[in-house]
């Protein structure tokens, strides 16, 4: 096989001109953003969803999620991931599955789902799709499935299949994050202890999927074996970096959230214990006063 090498300076100066304005991406994101703005604007009033409008922070988070999707799929990162580097593709996947969904969910007011929950069939489907067992399984199965080398290569070769892959990534990632971040009363998040178990499972799943990729002695993705070499990275090094990006990136994020939730839960438990102890002291004090009053009345 004859390897093609790019001059670093020439490549670096030209890569910034590689923007891919795919109509399906632009139209899809425009529809999603338009629907969101309608729901938090005219739709909120017309449907009587809430007297409380979406906050500036919520709007900023949702719009940020759309911008990140847009940049991930049309910017030079897309060119790098589709034609040169497996590691760039994994960075793209990190953005689409671990950064975009939390921002998107945090940007949706809890009252936005009231119309859906009024229809029994839709409410049943929504509860099913946000069940933590379903969300955990769906995300990890989809993520693992699309990283099988043969299917991965096919998705990169065919744009429509690649679009489907990204749609499945984002949709199942939103499902995966929902039990952790929901602000909806109708579709509430799980308890703090359950969140910790959930995050621990996600961290382990990331290791199981990407450890074989990271520690493989041979390149697993034929597509990148035949790709031009840039930045003096050979195929195996690129693959190892990609595996580390996913394994470490996902693991660090999940464990950081685990620690944060644990500390919050532990503090709440301490506060509850102190509150119960205080109430018990007050009850005992009232009992003692009552007993003293009774004894005094008897003696008198």
Question: Where are these predicted regions, by residue range?
Answer:
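Alpha-helical membrane segments of multi-pass proteins
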Residues: 2-300
